[in-house]
């Protein structure tokens, strides 16, 4: 039986396992894991999330941060596809003071885990979404006066102050922030600061490139802009968190750590510039059936592969609907019995064929690694990206919504 789970259904399912998913106690988390393990026995594909590696990545990242710098763990896209509910006990255990999300559903899962700390949204939201998050104490990201005015009206209606992080465009993303190089931009920023019921608790920007020199240059601009705004708006510096650093910037431009950093990919082992943080996820399936084909047999749609000898093909119950791209056909390898096997023919919606002619011991039920490690062999992110012709996050965020997860230690 296929298990297709949206973020919301994952959250609901996590809540129905046991109260363990709402607890910070590790033994109770293991109880939930056992339930998930039983589910994958009836699934065609699954993800294995290594909680030990997740913890190690957090601890290693912490060791490079200034003592006074807060860490805000970015868990948008359901923790980059790894599952917020399953990772929150580790976040709480590691005493991470802030979590960043994108949607209200994600915010609810974080709060349901027992997390009482700072919770911020790292994208713009429309006013209905903001209103829906009031009871969750979500700090919003804003970058326009119109947003601030709408929030001020909501604050008055709800009789509740809304905390916000004001985005400046000094980093050059051009998607959320105010341009402080113009007089109009400065006037708008000051007007935002004066809105009743809107409390600025942070000033931030975001850098679009992995380029340390560029970051340093733009960091100087951000510092000037934020200092000007704090002074002219009569904000208390001690009440404002200045934050600009994602995973790359926090590790490679230490002077940009400021008051808070926002690591995302590095925690899950996806930071191409820093490979010392291993991936916490593996993507797996099993052999459904074996097929003996004579020489000159074609395989898959478009007959793009033809056998050159008598061959043994293993049918894998995974395809592009599970997040294994069509382009993997005739290009990618998978791991089976500790060896590499070629994907042959075009990957279908629900089926992938691999050539196991020269691999001994393959049988229905044999485990197949699509991404991750098996014995001494590895399928890594760079290999996946090359074969699929997409950036890795495009894949693992789909994996997380299309496949059940099991959490291992």
UniProtKB/Swiss-Prot annotation:
<comment type="similarity">
    <text>Belongs to the alanine racemase family. Bsr subfamily.</text>
</comment>
<feature type="disulfide bond">
    <location>
        <begin position="72"/>
        <end position="98"/>
    </location>
</feature>
<feature type="modified residue" description="N6-(pyridoxal phosphate)lysine">
    <location>
        <position position="76"/>
    </location>
</feature>
<feature type="binding site">
    <location>
        <position position="349"/>
    </location>
    <ligand>
        <name>substrate</name>
    </ligand>
</feature>
<feature type="active site" description="Proton acceptor">
    <location>
        <position position="76"/>
    </location>
</feature>
<dbReference type="InterPro" id="IPR000821">
    <property type="entry name" value="Ala_racemase"/>
</dbReference>
<keyword id="KW-0732">Signal</keyword>
<dbReference type="GO" id="GO:0008784">
    <property type="term" value="F:alanine racemase activity"/>
</dbReference>
<dbReference type="InterPro" id="IPR043698">
    <property type="entry name" value="Racemase_Bsr/Lyr"/>
</dbReference>
<dbReference type="InterPro" id="IPR011079">
    <property type="entry name" value="Ala_racemase_C"/>
</dbReference>
<comment type="function">
    <text>Amino-acid racemase able to utilize a broad range of substrates.</text>
</comment>
<dbReference type="GO" id="GO:0042597">
    <property type="term" value="C:periplasmic space"/>
</dbReference>
<dbReference type="InterPro" id="IPR029066">
    <property type="entry name" value="PLP-binding_barrel"/>
</dbReference>
<feature type="signal peptide">
    <location>
        <begin position="1"/>
        <end position="25"/>
    </location>
</feature>
<dbReference type="Pfam" id="PF00842">
    <property type="entry name" value="Ala_racemase_C"/>
</dbReference>
<dbReference type="GO" id="GO:0018113">
    <property type="term" value="F:lysine racemase activity"/>
</dbReference>
<feature type="binding site">
    <location>
        <position position="175"/>
    </location>
    <ligand>
        <name>substrate</name>
    </ligand>
</feature>
<dbReference type="Pfam" id="PF01168">
    <property type="entry name" value="Ala_racemase_N"/>
</dbReference>
<dbReference type="GO" id="GO:0030170">
    <property type="term" value="F:pyridoxal phosphate binding"/>
</dbReference>
<protein>
    <recommendedName>
        <fullName>Broad specificity amino-acid racemase</fullName>
        <ecNumber>5.1.1.10</ecNumber>
    </recommendedName>
</protein>
<keyword id="KW-0663">Pyridoxal phosphate</keyword>
<dbReference type="InterPro" id="IPR020622">
    <property type="entry name" value="Ala_racemase_pyridoxalP-BS"/>
</dbReference>
<dbReference type="GO" id="GO:0005829">
    <property type="term" value="C:cytosol"/>
</dbReference>
<keyword id="KW-0574">Periplasm</keyword>
<dbReference type="InterPro" id="IPR001608">
    <property type="entry name" value="Ala_racemase_N"/>
</dbReference>
<keyword id="KW-0413">Isomerase</keyword>
<dbReference type="InterPro" id="IPR009006">
    <property type="entry name" value="Ala_racemase/Decarboxylase_C"/>
</dbReference>
<dbReference type="GO" id="GO:0047679">
    <property type="term" value="F:arginine racemase activity"/>
</dbReference>
<feature type="active site" description="Proton acceptor">
    <location>
        <position position="301"/>
    </location>
</feature>
<keyword id="KW-1015">Disulfide bond</keyword>
């Amino acid at each position: 039986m296929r298990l297709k789970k949206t973020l919301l259904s994952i959250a609901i399912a996590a809540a129905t396992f046991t109260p363990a998913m709402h607890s910070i106690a590790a033994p109770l988390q293991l109880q939930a894991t056992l339930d998930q393990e039983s589910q994958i026995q009836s699934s065609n594909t699954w993800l294995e999330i290594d909680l030990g590696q997740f913890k190690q990545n957090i601890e290693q990242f912490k060791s490079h941060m200034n003592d006074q710098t807060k860490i805000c763990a970015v868990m948008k896209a359901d923790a980059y596809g790894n599952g917020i509910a399953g990772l929150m006990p580790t976040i709480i255990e590691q005493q991470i003071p802030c979590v960043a999300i994108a949607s209200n559903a994600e915010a609810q899962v974080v709060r349901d885990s027992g997390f009482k700390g700072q919770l911020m949204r790292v994208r713009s939201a429309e006013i209905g979404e903001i209103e829906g998050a009031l009871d969750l104490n979500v700090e919003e990201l804003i970058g326009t006066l119109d947003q601030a005015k709408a929030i001020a009206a909501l604050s008055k209606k709800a009789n509740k102050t809304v905390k916000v992080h004001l985005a400046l465009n000094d980093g050059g993303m051009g998607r959320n922030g105010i341009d402080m190089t113009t007089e109009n931009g400065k006037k708008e920023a000051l007007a935002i600061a004066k809105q009743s019921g809107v409390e600025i608790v942070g000033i931030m920007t975001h850098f679009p490139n992995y380029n340390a020199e560029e970051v340093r240059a733009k960091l100087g601009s951000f510092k000037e802009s934020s200092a000007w705004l704090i002074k002219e708006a009569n904000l208390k510096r001690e009440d404002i968190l200045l934050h600009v650093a994602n995973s790359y910037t926090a590790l490679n431009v230490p002077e940009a750590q400021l008051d808070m950093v926002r690591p995302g990919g590095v925690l899950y082992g996806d930071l191409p510039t820093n490979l010392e943080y291993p991936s916490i996820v593996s993507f797996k399936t099993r052999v459904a059936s074996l097929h003996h084909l004579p020489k000159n047999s074609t395989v898959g749609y478009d007959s793009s592969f033809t056998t050159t000898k008598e061959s043994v093909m293993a049918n894998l119950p995974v395809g592009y609907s599970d997040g294994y791209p069509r382009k993997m056909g005739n290009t990618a390898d998978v791991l089976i019995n500790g060896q590499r096997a070629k994907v042959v023919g075009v990957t279908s919606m629900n089926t992938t064929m691999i050539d196991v002619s020269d691999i001994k011991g393959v049988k229905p039920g044999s485990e197949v690694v699509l991404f991750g490690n098996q014995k001494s062999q590895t399928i890594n992110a760079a290999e996946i990206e090359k074969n699929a012709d997409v950036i890795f996050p495009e894949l693992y965020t789909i994996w997380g919504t299309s496949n059940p997860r099991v959490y291992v230690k």
